[in-house]
């Protein structure tokens, strides 16, 4: 079906699939995106996603005002990811693999794990916004460049609608 950015998806009876790795800001605005085959592990797409940031990123600083945080899930809990994010100057918030957290009272959970308040729902919401576009939900494009162009158009549309700059 596609070029190198598709691969067999084991949960979909070996049909080709595409995985989107998305980096968003705190409001859900997309700032970096990359694609690969559906059978590719998330951790291996981290560097490409960080390299595809399309806006000018201020240099990280020791002051609290310029620190840049990144929230990831347990799928990124590998030493290579820690080193990469340290190289890029991010303050990492990640849940450790094999550690269960209290799913009950939110106040109690925050008190127990103050540095693990990863807000993954922001990224999931942006993926949901992207899935409103049928062209992305069902991949019809055979060429990777065409699919990436549509992804960038959708990211621009989301930024336009969420930004409120033009009314």
Residue ranges and their predicted role:
Residues 1-91, 96-97, 154:
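Polybasic low-complexity intrinsically disordered regions
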Residues 5-7, 11, 111, 139-142, ...:
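Compositionally biased, low-complexity segments enriched in small residues
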Residues 150-167:
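Charged phosphate-binding loop/patch that engages nucleotide di/tri-phosphates or the phosphate backbone
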Residues 55-58, 135, 158, 162:
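Generic structural signal for secondary-structure transition and capping sites
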